[in-house]
Every structure is written in structure tokens, then in C-alpha cells.
């Protein structure tokens, strides 16, 4: 999945729940420009803002691979998930190389010391072979 597909999924979920951008902006504190950046996917954006957006529309991210699943309600959940998955399967160096990043970035994600962009988030989810879904809580 790429950023455009992810953004279209977010926009579609918001529209299907009949929630206005104004309400999302009011509930999250995100500006109209930030919401447009998320929904139009012209540029990358922070997953921190995505989790605010999802909270405002009453949703979360579900990750699925066969019988394995994980629910992400915030960026901290993502760091924990990466640590758990990487520890079982792949070294930090191998993951960084696979997603075109570096060990420092992986360390910061796992210790919740770094803002994660949507493109990196999607690459990591794909690297572990998981399918992403936006689900109502």
C-alpha cells in the first residue's frame, strides 16, 4: 500500500461515517491545511496526526497477517509492535536495509523518540507482511 491508497482509505472511512472535516479539525486541533495534506496525500505526513485523525472519527488501525493481528491506537503502540516483530524475525540492520532507512531511525521508532512519517510506517508494515485496515472502534 502506498500513501495515496492509505489516504484514500482514510478519506473514504471518514466519509462513510458521515463525519465532516470541520468536526475532525475541531476534535484534533489539526488545521484545514493539515487535514488536506492527509487526505490529498500530495506530501508525506506524520503518523501522530493520523492517530489523532483516527481518534476523531472513532477508528483505529488493524494489522493482519494470517491468524496474527494487532490493533494500533497510537504511535507508541507502533513502536512496541515493531520491537516485538523485529525481535522475533529480523535484525535492526536487516530491517533498516529492507525499508531503505538506517539503524538510528529504527531505534528511535522502537523507543518512541521519533515522529514516524506515513511512508516509513507503510514500508515497515509491508516489510513484516501485514495487511492494514482502518476499523471502527
Predicted feature locations:
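Hydrophobic, helix-prone linear segments
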Residues: 1-5, 37, 44-46
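A short, Lys/Arg-rich alpha-helix, primarily the initiator
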Residues: 1-16, 64-88
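Tyrosine-centered aromatic motifs in long, intrinsically disordered, low-complexity repeat arrays
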Residues: 6-9, 22, 50, 57-59, ...
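Short, structured motif recognition centered on aromatic/hydrophobic residues
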Residues: 10, 61, 82, 106, ...
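Short alpha-helical DNA-recognition segment
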Residues: 18-36, 88-107
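DNA major-groove recognition helix of helix-turn-helix/homeodomain DNA-binding modules
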Residues: 46-63, 117-134
Amino acid at each position: 500500500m502506498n500513501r495515496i491508497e492509505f489516504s484514500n482509505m482514510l478519506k473514504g472511512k471518514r466519509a462513510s461515517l458521515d463525519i465532516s472535516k470541520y468536526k475532525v479539525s475541531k476534535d484534533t486541533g489539526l488545521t484545514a491545511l493539515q487535514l488536506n495534506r492527509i487526505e490529498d496525500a500530495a506530501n508525506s505526513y506524520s503518523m501522530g496526526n493520523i492517530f489523532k485523525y483516527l481518534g476523531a472519527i472513532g477508528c483505529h488501525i488493524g494489522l493482519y497477517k494470517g491468524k496474527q493481528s494487532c490493533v494500533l491506537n497510537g504511535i507508541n503502540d507502533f513502536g512496541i509492535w515493531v520491537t516485538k516483530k523485529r525481535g522475533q524475525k529480523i535484525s535492526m540492520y536487516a530491517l533498516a536495509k529492507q525499508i531503505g532507512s538506517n539503524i538510528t531511525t529504527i531505534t528511535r521508532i522502537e523507543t518512541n523518540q521519533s515522529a514516524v512519517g506515513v511512508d516509513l510506517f507503510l514500508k515497515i508494515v509491508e516489510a513484516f507482511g501485514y495487511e492494514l485496515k482502518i476499523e471502527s472502534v
